Amino acid sequence: MPAADPQRLLELINGCWTTQALCATVELGIADTLADQPMDAATLARCAGTDSQATARLLRALVSLGVCECHGTVYGLTANGRLLAAGPGPSLRGWATLAGRGLWAPWHGLADSVRTGLGHHARDGHDRFEALDGDAEAASAFQQAMSELTALIAGPVAAIIGGRLVGTGHIVDVGGGHGGLLAAVLASRPGWHGTVFDRPHARAGAERLLREEGLADRVAIISGNFFDGVPAGDVLLLKSVLHDWGDNCSALLLRRCADALSPRGMLLAVERLMPEAPSDLPAHRALCRSDLNMLIGPGGCERTEPEFRALFATAGLSIVAVTPSAAGFVVIEARP
């Protein structure tokens, strides 16, 4: 057994401080301001309307995190820091805000979730996603964060999905949010059209994204609850949906999808695979944290490949291929 490393453990314990520092950087507009022009702490404080000394202390912390760089007294963003600023290209600013605000309180209940096996939504009798329909601000923050995470993996995952599509057809993105992955798939498959199916709160964002991508005439947007049924299609796509839900709810959703598939249709689920024996690797740590995030929220989980195969079988679906992508996700192909 390796010797104890108290400093490493302290870094893990204090990880919550890092989350809040990054969230504050977005919330105060510091990343946006520095993206326009590097500047000293006093000038930045005037632009952001913050205290000069406190701003300097936050900037010092951001340098230590590799988010900012300092030359003399002038601070600027590193490449990672630019992911916290608004603008075109990859971004994680929405995720930083969601992690620091929307997910903060639920994580306080992790011990209770481990005691009971229930997420805080189940304990409170609330449906997390249904609640978003009545909270425009929370819904916008959630969908922005989800869109950012999807954009990071859309390229390699869409290439795999596109390779499964031949000729013409109809693909339904179930729980598709703003439709970013569907848009990436359809960009290289002009013979196909699609539908984004999600809760009502996602509709406006989907309309905007599809219009910007020039796909408004090829993609319909339908609002609803996928546990009640899903639109019919030749291909049904589920990206990071099954991990939200426990086995009973996931099996019901898969049965709804199986019922909606056209003859000889297929279901494609984009998920990450939990390793049989996780270790102290960055990818494993990220996946295990996500697994706990699902536990404390809607009650879902990350699954191993055998667990996915058993789950799909309960819905009358057979997994015929599991294709890894360069983005760390796999594309699970299943058929009735």
Predicted feature locations:
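Alpha-helical subdomain
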Residues: 1-70, 163-166, 170-336
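Conserved Class I S-adenosyl-L-methionine-dependent methyltransferase catalytic core
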Residues: 6-27, 32-33, 38, 47, ...
